[in-house]
């Protein structure tokens, strides 16, 4: 199995992992509008507000990202008895996958970060917050709830935004309890004194935070490694994962191993919350049994996804799979998409009046028979989507020695063909769910089927589509090719 295949499989294993996240919950508000003039009162732009949204921020965004990759997080935090606190509690409750343990502290100001945007450009951020440590009674409640949740957790995350939930006594105590229970601890740190996180498994400072915590220059790879090693030596961390914006990430481990991961983003729109995505993906991966380098690789890929979105965004599991495939692609890379993204593209095609076709198969060792069917399929429509069985699906259908080529390789070959407009990898034995989602106008299969035996034929016909049986090329099959290769 290739490293890529292993990572793709790892993404699936993120589902159902239990991660305990403790930290500062916030409310992220986004105000979108347009700017067409300068204020006569001062040399500042006038934002004409068009819409507003709100979502979980701070440690809450870590939890959102955990849910996005399929994890089942428990969330322990504190809010005030104010409107923002009630909104945070409501937003947490909207995610059925989250086990919420939100403690209300009377009189506390719930942190609100309000960002103003015009044409994807952030103009201003306005904060309302409290940085005071939570009271002793609240701290006792937090510890009681965490003690109950810790045994079930694969990993504990401390998401410290310096708003009081993880003030020194509680951070130290939580790490002590987690280590005693044999749990890994990931810390997204705040401030300059990292000794309060001593004994944590991994800390994830950005470049600026690393400089402030160590006082060292962090411009080059060598300087970043030296500063990270200082933290490892002084605080007993197993590893430091440094996020370095356009320079990617650097993982430095106590055993001396170093991994430099290049930035994955193609275009950066907004870095809001990217650090939360890194922490969440890293935690879910470690909870699933991944090694630190594997987990860091996935976290780096996830960060590249979210900075390409506007606002405090998340990276979904299917987006991770697509991004992993793209690492090895040269031609047709934009053609390989998850079914959710394919549905959006198909909708755009339909609005332009284009007829959408669909065919599917394993396409292991592409041969003239495959090429002929794809050409006939494209001839029956304007845009052709190819459903591709995943490696696991092919193995169930064809046996333990198949596929010969990985799903990444098969998708790459298909996407390089001019007849193919999109490739969607599916893990089920049949493409029925994909067909139901995309609702193609034309469904194409080889003439070795009859229409009543074609999976999805009744569905396509139910919405007025048609089923086309493509002519076969005699003697062409992957099985025959494999037999010839084996001398049979």
UniProtKB/Swiss-Prot annotation:
Task: Write out the GO MF terms.
Answer: ATP binding; heptose 7-phosphate kinase activity; heptose-1-phosphate adenylyltransferase activity; phosphotransferase activity, alcohol group as acceptor
Which top-level group of life is the source organism from? Bacteria
Q: What is its EC number?
A: 2.7.1.167, 2.7.7.70
What does UniProt give as GO cellular component? cytosol
Q: A biological process (GO) annotation for this entry?
A: ADP-L-glycero-beta-D-manno-heptose biosynthetic process
Give a single Pfam family match. Answer: CTP_transf_like
Which pathway, per its entry?
Nucleotide-sugar biosynthesis; ADP-L-glycero-beta-D-manno-heptose biosynthesis; ADP-L-glycero-beta-D-manno-heptose from D-glycero-beta-D-manno-heptose 7-phosphate: step 1/4; Nucleotide-sugar biosynthesis; ADP-L-glycero-beta-D-manno-heptose biosynthesis; ADP-L-glycero-beta-D-manno-heptose from D-glycero-beta-D-manno-heptose 7-phosphate: step 3/4
Q: Where is this region: Cytidylyltransferase?
A: 358-488
Q: Which UniProt keywords apply?
A: ATP-binding, Carbohydrate metabolism, Kinase, Multifunctional enzyme, Nucleotide-binding, Nucleotidyltransferase, Transferase
What is the annotated quaternary arrangement, including any partners?
Homodimer.
What family is this?
A: In the N-terminal section; belongs to the carbohydrate kinase PfkB family. In the C-terminal section; belongs to the cytidylyltransferase family.
Report what the protein is called. Bifunctional protein HldE
Query: Organism source for this protein?
Result: Paramagnetospirillum magneticum (strain ATCC 700264 / AMB-1)
Task: Identify the coding gene.
Answer: hldE
